[in-house]
């Protein structure tokens, strides 16, 4: 069977799997589990593969699941990855498949990622006698919370002998039929900083006798923006956001301490280093001016997701020739973080976005919103692109 004929047959079989995809996705949506707690989700995935007769490894790097599908002829080892953890958010959707777990929901589409990859695995397994190479399905736990599940799975051998990896994220603000993929950085390094300011408290009526931690902290918050505008090359991109400012005191008491917590985002490692150093320089200077002291910690989170050029071109070419794909665009890099970055630091590959906006505009909500949902037809698009990229990779 020619590769083009095989691809059409696989797409036809994926069409036949769509109702099962929806059923599986809705099951996960109703019974979500938080990062590092995905016991039942992992068990469901393992049971599905066992029903197909596909060899698996469980508890990979924690709760990860690996499935191996061997083609009938030698070829490259291609890995496909889907994450499966949920978020601590109360589901507010009025749909039959809304979360049944209070305070927990799939608000980022990981349920759809998993359902799509299971369908791909099923169809590849059914056609294994026509395939060249080995196909590794990586079902990853704990993407949402650092240190994440990718690195422990890699340390536990999930990429052993792997030549390339592909992954996707269903993107609920982009229309169905859209694929966004570009070489280079596509998602940012996501870091966290904590600043503790130690001043001198006192009565609100006597500010001259104090070292006001709230005033000092406020100046720090404002001055941090000067780093982005004056210390980072304008050709580069960076974000510094202070998300928490804590100085809990009665209304008439000047605070002696304040705690600032925020995030720094960047695409380039040199810029990342600049942000870490310059944040402390700002804190040190302002605290010194006021005669205050400070503690500063900077925690590096996931690195930037950086796509490899040749593999990205392959994915783009595949997507352009995939049924159901209406447009393939570069898109803009996202300031969100993703631990898929670790896979791409170890093997070649690419990460792309699959448009998944619900058909009704009033149902379109951003990721991590309590009313988040996807157009379930996007799972089929994602599955076809992933399968196509995987089975044709040996032609590169």
Curated annotation (Swiss-Prot):
Similarity comment: Belongs to the peptidase M20A family.
Top-rank taxon, per record: Bacteria
Co-factor(s): Zn(2+); Co(2+)
Lineage: Bacteria, Bacillati, Bacillota, Bacilli, Bacillales
Sorted UniProt keywords: Cobalt, Hydrolase, Metal-binding, Zinc
Co-factor: note: Binds 2 Zn(2+) or Co(2+) ions per subunit.
Enzyme Commission identifier(s): 3.5.1.-
Binding-site positions, Zn(2+) 2: 144, 368
PANTHER family: METALLOPEPTIDASE, PUTATIVE (AFU_ORTHOLOGUE AFUA_6G09600)-RELATED (PTHR11014:SF63), PEPTIDASE M20 FAMILY MEMBER (PTHR11014)
MF-aspect GO terms: hydrolase activity; metal ion binding
Keyword Zinc: yes
One Pfam family cited in the UniProt record for this chain: M20_dimer
Protein's UniProt name: Putative amidohydrolase YhaA
Binding site for Zn(2+) 1: 182
NCBIfam families: amidohydrolases
Gene coding for it: yhaA
